[in-house]
Amino acid sequence: MVVPLQLQVPVTREGLRQAAEALRDWLAAAGLEGDAAYGAELGLEELGSNLLRHASPEGAATQLQIEARHSGALLELELIDNGAPFDPTTAALPNLHRPIQERPIGGLGLLLMRRMAAQLQYERLTDGNRLVCRFRAKARAAPPG
């Protein structure tokens, strides 16, 4: 079993860059690759960019807590922020049937995240948001010998 990744970063471009790098390193050390690893990276990137983009002085998130765990065939990414309520499991998705030039920008990351995750679970906390993303994971095969 791989030791879980636990870190807390400020909601800044640099903080999110450091979190993404730490997650990539942890995924590689855990031998995780493919859709689960990509989904976890996408989940962190999507939530982080939404926190940056939609941050307003009132209710803006300032901290993001990240925990990643791997057990058996499951990769779990837990993201907790101290911002205003935002439930990515119910947020409106883009209408893919409209011509691209008529679609508003945004929402495709959430769409991909919902499609890649085996389960997304949102909870509003007293002072923030908690999102748990679960992915079906396959570890890299160990080299023979």
Predicted regions and their residues:
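Flexible, glycine-/charge-rich segments associated with ATP-binding catalytic modules
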Residues: 1-8, 114-145
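Conserved short strand/loop->alpha-helix "switch" segment adjacent to the catalytic nucleotide/phosphoryl-transfer site
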Residues: 21-45, 102-104
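Conserved N-box asparagine in the HATPase_c
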Residues: 50, 54
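A short, flexible helix-to-loop-to-beta junction within the catalytic ATP-binding CA
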Residues: 55-60
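Short beta-strand/loop element within the Bergerat-fold HATPase_c
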Residues: 63-73
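Glycine-rich/acidic phosphate-handling loop/turn and adjacent ATP-lid/helix
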Residues: 77-105
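Glycine-rich phosphate-binding loop
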Residues: 102-117
